[in-house]
Design a protein with these regions (language model features):
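Arg/Gly-rich low-complexity intrinsically disordered repeat tracts
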Residues: 1-35
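Extended alpha-helical targeting/anchoring segments
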Residues: 37-395
Length: 395
């Protein structure tokens, strides 16, 4: 028979064992949690490998034509028709290793080891938090590591993630393109037209073997394929002419009531085609050279365009916005161009719009900057085909 003393002794042993098991399970759970957090926040380290080669026989377009079939889902970013040597760089990005996209309220991380993470974008976890968290996963050291950033786009509809503005997805917006998409490329080709040099740059993982020679050989290949482009059928638009005119009348009414300062009403056009749309980009850059030319191949879709305008530029601890409002054509006659420029400078409508955009730029920068000022105001900038009225706001 168990005595009271023996019973208490066994009960104490049982309680002690239970306590030890409890604390052991807590320690195990804590260890697993820490391990999971470390895995979730795994950092990817890279070291840059670079090589500079003579570039007087190569252009960004010809080089892109040579490498794009070897390295699919590549990107071309050109700068042309610009006055300053410090900004005259062109880039080709090859071999995506990671990406971050935001669409339908979800941020998706695709990481170098093949893992895919989804993070809901909410009021607490905003789009900028997702982009910052993604960037913090990567640490790149070495010469020219500043070039090894994210390349991609933020679409107009992405305003829903930064402002309290609802965006209704239209039928034509339902495609493969997310609202935000940025890519980290393994290889970069950087063109310096003033020095006639090309910089070949590679992000190399620890223990990896450089394959930069593969890029160099592709660049020096004399044989590459140029494909044709042909439009098929008629150009169509989801909006009829009358529907577009009705939208314009409604926009004018909102302006007259003081609801808004300005409304830009775009109209989508669609054109079926066969062949290579890069030929269309080449035609665009020929008739409209600009400081910002881009062609991105994302696999399921492609985007390209040409723009003279800097949306926002950050250098060090300073941010810059260059409002452009007011445009007139170049004539080829310097005297007539001067007359057109003076007319543009004094035009009341162009001046009203320009003042409004300068004020908007000041307001935008003031939300995140101090010492906001106008660096220059209503400067005439001459491009190959047009003259622009440009100001610069900084903070």
């Amino acid at each position: 028979k168990l005595t009271v003393t023996t019973y208490c002794y066994y009960l104490l042993l049982l309680l002690t064992a239970t306590t030890y098991c409890y604390y052991y399970l807590l320690l195990l759970l804590f260890t697993v949690t820490i391990y999971s957090i470390k895995e979730a926040m795994k950092q990817y380290n890279y070291q840059t490998v670079s090589r500079t080669v003579l570039g007087d026989l190569h252009t960004p377009v010809s080089t892109y034509l040579k490498v794009r079939d070897i390295f699919p889902q590549s990107a071309l970013m050109e700068s042309s028709d610009y006055h300053g040597s410090e900004n005259n760089r062109s880039f080709i990005g090859l071999c995506p290793v990671a990406s971050v996209s935001i669409d339908h309220g979800t941020a998706v991380f695709r990481l170098p080891d093949g893992t895919r993470e989804e993070h809901p974008v909410t009021g607490e976890y905003r789009a900028e938090n997702a982009l910052r968290d993604f960037l913090n996963r990567f640490h790149v050291e070495g010469e020219y590591s500043d070039y090894c950033g994210l390349y991609g786009y933020t679409s107009f509809n992405a305003v829903r993630y930064f402002e309290n503005i609802p965006v209704k997805d239209s039928r034509e917006a339902t495609n493969d393109a997310p609202d935000i998409l940025y890519i980290l490329y393994k290889y970069l080709i950087v063109f310096n037209d003033f020095k006639n040099e090309m910089l070949l740059l590679e992000m190399l993982a620890p223990g990896g073997k450089s394959e930069l020679d593969k890029v160099r050989k592709a660049i020096h290949n004399r044989n590459y394929t140029v494909y044709d482009f042909r439009a098929v059928g008629e150009t169509t638009s989801p909006l009829t002419d009358e529907e577009h005119k009705a939208n314009i009348r409604q926009g004018i009414a909102h302006c007259m009531r003081g609801d808004v300062f300005q409304i830009v009403l775009s109209r989508r056009f669609e054109q079926r085609f066969t062949g290579d749309d890069f030929k269309l980009y080449r035609a665009l850059r020929s008739i409209n050279p600009s400081p910002y030319l881009f062609y991105f191949d994302f696999g399921g879709f492609r985007i390209f365009g040409s723009s003279p305008e800097t949306h926002c530029r950050i250098e060090g601890r300073h941010a810059y916005i260059d409002p452009i409002a007011g445009t007139t054509k170049r004539t080829g006659d310097p005297e007539q161009d001067a007359v057109n420029a003076r007319y543009l400078h004094d035009d009341p409508k162009e001046n009203a719009e320009h003042v409004m955009l300068v004020d908007l730029a000041r307001n935008d920068l003031s939300r995140n900057c101090h010492d906001v000022k106008v660096d220059f105001y209503k400067e005439m900038q001459y491009y190959s085909h047009v003259i622009h009225l440009v100001s610069r706001v900084s903070g």
